[in-house]
């Protein structure tokens, strides 16, 4: 097992990465024997993993209850959060309880947001089971739910007490979910690390075959990059916003199509293509780098074209509701080369529309 740390003073926490680590002693730190906890998962994962996780929690002496939610992005809502809060109250969980998120990004977001507001804040532990949540969503403290008018519009920053990344969970992950997670992996490489991008160009096929050694390295690399950013800019006041590369366009696709119609990583893949094309059109990104980004996304099996039934103009209202908008001005994360990105504002909307049209 390898351990990284997100350094945030008294709120620092470990990220544990390895194979079959869910059964290791003290893996559920900061929980101690006799502590109360609530496991939150969905119906699919409950059938696959709940008994195993329950066994190890009870073996550790934890008093554990459960909430089993519906499965899918369309259920990342305030209504599902109310299910969690009601269960906590009915089971008489106090302020020293710990919520445990067993699942992907949806479960992690719902659990984290619930933890942030239940009795004004309780601890929670992330046990991410998808590649997307292992490399991105479980680390950093962003929690929230969707609104009809936009993705993740209601939420809070609430850091977990620990993150437990067991790569064995990926062996039961549907292949399209694995591919979806690769979008966030590629994101890190494009905006932060040219060497990692080259490594992905060489190893993406074997990663998709779930080579343990390669996957452990890949997850660790992504978590290291994100942990460094979180330590410097926890509340996204500055360059943490770079992590939203592709998300302004991608969230528009998700909202327009209906949450759950496109997997998050699929929408972000197309969003990264659109952002890269925008950067090329304004003279920042070289055509060769644009083609390399496009090629790697294709190699990973990710979509590079937006939905045919969504016009370029229909992206703009969603993009203007993006959380990076300041004083009515759209701000976009654009790559300027492989391994570097910047935040741009004031880009001509006709250029943005052209980039979208070129990616349809």
Curated annotation (Swiss-Prot):
Gene Ontology biological process terms, A to Z: amino acid biosynthetic process; aromatic amino acid family biosynthetic process; chorismate biosynthetic process
EC number(s) on file: 4.2.3.4
List of residues binding Zn(2+): 184, 247, 264
Keywords: Amino-acid biosynthesis, Aromatic amino acid biosynthesis, Cobalt, Cytoplasm, Lyase, Metal-binding, NAD, Nucleotide-binding, Zinc
UniProt key word Oxidoreductase: no
GO molecular function: 3-dehydroquinate synthase activity; metal ion binding; nucleotide binding
The reaction(s) this protein catalyses: 7-phospho-2-dehydro-3-deoxy-D-arabino-heptonate = 3-dehydroquinate + phosphate
Amino-acid positions noted as binding NAD(+) in the UniProt annotation, renumbered to this chain: 71-76, 105-109, 129-130, 142, 151, 169-172
Localization of this protein: Cytoplasm
Known pathway: Metabolic intermediate biosynthesis; chorismate biosynthesis; chorismate from D-erythrose 4-phosphate and phosphoenolpyruvate: step 2/7
Bound cofactor: record note: Binds 1 divalent metal cation per subunit. Can use either Co(2+) or Zn(2+).
Free-text function comment from the UniProt entry: Catalyzes the conversion of 3-deoxy-D-arabino-heptulosonate 7-phosphate (DAHP) to dehydroquinate (DHQ).
Stored PANTHER family: 3-DEHYDROQUINATE SYNTHASE, 3-DEHYDROQUINATE SYNTHASE, CHLOROPLASTIC
NCBIfam families: aroB
Protein name: 3-dehydroquinate synthase
């Amino acid at each position: 097992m390898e351990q990284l740390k997100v350094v945030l003073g008294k709120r620092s926490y470990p990220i544990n990465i390895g194979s079959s680590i869910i059964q290791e002693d003290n893996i559920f730190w900061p929980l101690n024997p006799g502590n109360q906890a609530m496991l939150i998962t969905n119906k699919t994962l409950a059938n696959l993993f709940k008994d195993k996780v329950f066994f190890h929690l009870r073996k550790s002496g934890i008093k554990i209850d459960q909430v089993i939610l519906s499965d899918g992005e369309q259920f990342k809502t305030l209504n599902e959060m109310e299910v969690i809060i009601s269960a906590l109250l009915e089971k008489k969980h106090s302020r020293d309880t710990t919520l445990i998120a067993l699942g992907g990004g949806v479960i992690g977001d719902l659990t984290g947001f619930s933890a942030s507001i239940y009795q004004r804040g309780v601890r929670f532990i992330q046990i991410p089971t998808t590649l997307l949540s292992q490399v991105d969503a479980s680390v950093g403290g962003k929690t929230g739910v969707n609104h009809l008018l936009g993705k993740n519009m209601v939420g809070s920053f609430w850091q977990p007490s620990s993150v437990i990344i067991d790569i064995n969970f990926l062996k039961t992950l549907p292949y399209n979910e694995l591919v979806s997670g690769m979008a966030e992996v590629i994101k890190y490489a494009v905006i932060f690390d040219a060497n990692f991008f080259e490594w992905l160009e060489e190893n993406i096929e074997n990663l998709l075959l779930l080579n343990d050694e390669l996957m452990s390295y890949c997850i660790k690399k992504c978590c290291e990059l994100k942990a460094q950013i979180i330590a410097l800019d926890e509340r996204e006041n500055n360059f943490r916003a770079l992590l939203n590369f592709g998300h302004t366009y991608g969230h528009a696709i998700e909202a327009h199509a209906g949450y759950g119609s496109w997997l998050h990583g699929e929408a972000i893949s197309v969003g990264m293509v659109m952002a890269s094309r925008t950067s090329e059109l304004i003279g920042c990104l070289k055509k060769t780098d644009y083609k390399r980004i496009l090629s790697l996304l294709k190699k990973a099996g990710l979509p590079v074209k937006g939905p045919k039934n969504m016009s370029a103009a229909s992206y703009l209202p969603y993009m203007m509701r993006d959380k990076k908008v300041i004083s009515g001005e759209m701000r976009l994360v654009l790559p300027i080369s492989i391994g570097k990105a910047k935040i741009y504002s004031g880009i001509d909307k006709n250029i943005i529309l052209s980039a979208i049209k070129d990616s349809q």
